[in-house]
């Protein structure tokens, strides 16, 4: 059947981007557009629940915000999940964020989802699903201990 990880992102403990993984494959990622009218500091928690059926190691995660590398820290690593965290500062009205395990252009164009988050109007939308089935949960009600950002 093929490998399928689960990949979610929690933003500020308030917004959850769910099912960002590909339908099949060892890659996970997404493209975000965040609209904000003033400076904001957002805390991101990246949660990978690996499918160990065909892999021995989970791929790392790379994050870029407006073409600048964002420092990503691994905060937990168990058999059931791997958690990374990062802080992204929004200085511009529009911030483009790329999150990925593999940066092939083809993955962003046809496979990874594209999501728009308007922090001004609080309208959050999946613009393109591509080869995934993402959805947005807001407000977030954490149903696993490691989803809480306290």
Swiss-Prot record:
Domain of life of the native organism: Viruses
BP-aspect Gene Ontology terms: symbiont-mediated suppression of host innate immune response; viral process
Pfam family, one: Pox_C7_F8A
Induction of its expression: Expressed in the early phase of the viral replicative cycle.
Residue ranges of the TM segments: none
InterPro entries given in the database record: Poxvirus_C7/F8A
Keywords assigned: Early protein, Host-virus interaction, Inhibition of host innate immune response by virus, Viral immunoevasion
Entry keyword annotation includes DNA repair: no
Keyword Membrane: no
Record family assignment: Belongs to the orthopoxvirus OPG027 family.
Record's function text: Inhibits antiviral activity induced by type I interferons. Does not block signal transduction of IFN, but is important to counteract the host antiviral state induced by a pre-treatment with IFN.
Name used for this protein in its record: Interferon antagonist OPG027
Species for this entry: Camelpox virus (strain CMS)
């Amino acid at each position: 059947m093929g490998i399928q990880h689960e990949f979610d992102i929690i933003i500020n403990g308030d917004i959850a981007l769910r099912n960002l993984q590909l339908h099949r494959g060892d890659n996970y990622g997404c493209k975000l557009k965040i609209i904000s009218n003033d400076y904001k500091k957002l805390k991101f928690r990246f949660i990978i629940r690996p499918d160990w059926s065909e892999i021995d190691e989970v791929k790392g995660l790379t994050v870029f915000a407006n073409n600048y590398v964002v420092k990503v820290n691994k905060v937990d690593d168990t058999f059931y999940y791997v958690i990374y965290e990062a802080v992204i500062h929004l200085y511009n009205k529009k911030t483009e964020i790329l999150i990925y395990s593999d940066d092939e252009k083809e993955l962003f164009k046809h496979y990874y989802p594209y999501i728009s988050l308007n922090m001004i109007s609080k309208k959050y939308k999946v613009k393109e699903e591509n080869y995934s089935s993402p959805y947005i949960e807001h407000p977030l009600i954490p149903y696993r201990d490691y989803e809480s950002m306290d």
